[in-house]
């Protein structure tokens, strides 16, 4: 379950970068290729745009989300921890049994997934609005941007 949640976060961040951001597609794909499975690296690639369009003054939501992302990244940097029982050198990831507060972990992951979906919808709306504005500028004034 933890792997699937983590993977959902990774894919949500990649969706923001490729589909919803103002990053041109060649640069977006380069970011994805370079950052691979690093949710912190992916987040750092999109945070400026998120701050520009989504952040409200005195809102601590982004700070809280950044803490979630850092915690999840630090716990499973390569996205292997919950996918495989051991690393490439055959050393087990968990020698001692680990007990997780699964309800709390699930809550944090779901909050992060919900926020990424919210950011996606906001950035998508902004891009649609900008596209409509360009069409209007062309139709009304003959201006092509």
Residue ranges and their predicted role:
Residues 1-145:
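Domain-scale activation on soluble regions of proteins
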């Amino acid at each position: 379950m933890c792997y699937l949640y983590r993977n959902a976060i990774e894919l949500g961040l990649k969706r923001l970068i490729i589909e919803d951001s103002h990053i041109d597609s060649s640069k977006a794909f380069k970011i994805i290729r370079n950052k691979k499975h690093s949710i912190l690296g992916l987040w750092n690639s999109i945070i400026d745009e998120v701050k520009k369009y989504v952040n409200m003054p005195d809102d601590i939501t982004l700070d809280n989300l950044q803490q979630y992302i850092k915690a999840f990244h630090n716990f499973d940097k390569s996205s292997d921890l919950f996918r495989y029982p051991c690393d490439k050198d055959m050393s087990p990831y968990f020698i001692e049994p680990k007990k997780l507060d699964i309800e709390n972990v699930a809550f944090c992951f779901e909050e992060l997934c919900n926020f990424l979906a919210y950011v996606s919808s906001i950035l998508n709306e902004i891009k649609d609005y900008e596209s409509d504005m360009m069409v209007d500028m062309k139709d009304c004034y003959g201006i092509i941007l």
